[in-house]
Amino acid sequence: MCDDVQALVVDNGSGMCKAGFAGDDAPRAVFPSIIGRPKQKSIMVGMGNKDAYVGDEVQSKRGILTLKYPIEHGIVTNWDDMEKIWHHTFYNELRVAPEEHPVLLTEAPLNPKANREKMTQIMFETFSVPAMYVAIQAVLSLYASGRTTGIVLDSGDGVSHTVPIYEGYALPHAILRLDLAGRDLTDYLMKILMERGYSFNTTAEREIVRDIKEKLCYIALDFEQEMKIAAESSSVEKSYELPDGNVITVGNERFRCPEVLFQPNFIGMEAAGVHETTFNSIGKCDIDIRKDLYGNVVLSGGTTMFEGIAERMTKELTNMAPASMKIKVVAPPERKYSVWIGGSILASLSTFQQMWITKEEYEDAGPGIVHRKSF
């Protein structure tokens, strides 16, 4: 396969798309996975108005656009819009000709087979790529941490998964999905800040709350204890300056917001928290490999970026696991992008080059070829 041509790595998340070149240590382009279409067909002549906007451009024009997220809970649900996102990725963000580069795409765990075939078809038929490959997101995160066995808790904007992986292969029967992620935490923070008398309603204000979440929230080691401390002193209080210059004070909301990951009932969800989901996932695996999984719990995705998460995970898993079990939770500092980084590593390995699905193979066998050549 083309040794001299750099492969492209595209990680399509529910909230953000991360894209760049294999061999790089970080993605070149990170933009929101959103499509915006004008609410009215333009009356303004000669404005050069497009029928659709993608990514950051949508954010700046959001008042006049109808917004759509083509990836819901990690799964592509609107292929026309997805095609626009890929087009934008290649031509506007990376500024490359896709027909000249092999492309590594990522997919959610348990992505339906038909979806994977559709991705393959679009890459070869619409973008004429010379070769492509589809890898499971959590597996890439594990590679990025230098492991081939472990359990990944991957939590992004739209969905969380626990994915046990043994010697490089995900174990599908033990993968669990939790429809609780960054977007829900932002919603919950909006709600509890309202109780303090701060009102955030519009989509633009929602972005402000997301920023507050990312900058000020943390996970308590002991929630009840932290609530007591917060009630008795102002040590947890922090101030945040809004874009208009006003300053707001955030107190116990700082740790109440991400506590939802461990106690989904806070937002009325009847689901196990991330710690329990991880435990259940390990329990679905063969007893002989559980020790290897408990010793390699790898966090991945933007929603695992909260301070204190590794300590809390360790504590909760220790309480649930068999008494003698050694538990190690790994939280790599670059975990926000570890899926992309894993893809960058994989696509540049010499041993991986025979794994690409080439245009010729696709033309011979059709979209089904993707199942034979991906893990």
From Swiss-Prot:
It comes from Naegleria fowleri. It is found in: Cytoplasm, Cytoskeleton. One of its GO terms (cellular component) is cytoskeleton. SMART domains: ACTIN (SM00268). The keyword ATP-binding applies. This is Actin-1. Belongs to the actin family. PANTHER family: ACTIN. The modification N-acetylaspartate is found at residue 3. Actins are highly conserved proteins that are involved in various types of cell motility and are ubiquitously expressed in all eukaryotic cells. Pfam families: Actin. It is an enzyme of class 3 (hydrolase). Keywords: Acetylation, ATP-binding, Cytoplasm, Cytoskeleton, Hydrolase, Nucleotide-binding. It catalyses: ATP + H2O = ADP + phosphate + H(+). GO terms for molecular function: ATP binding; hydrolase activity. Residues 1-2 form a propeptide. Signal peptide: none annotated. Its EC number is 3.6.4.-.
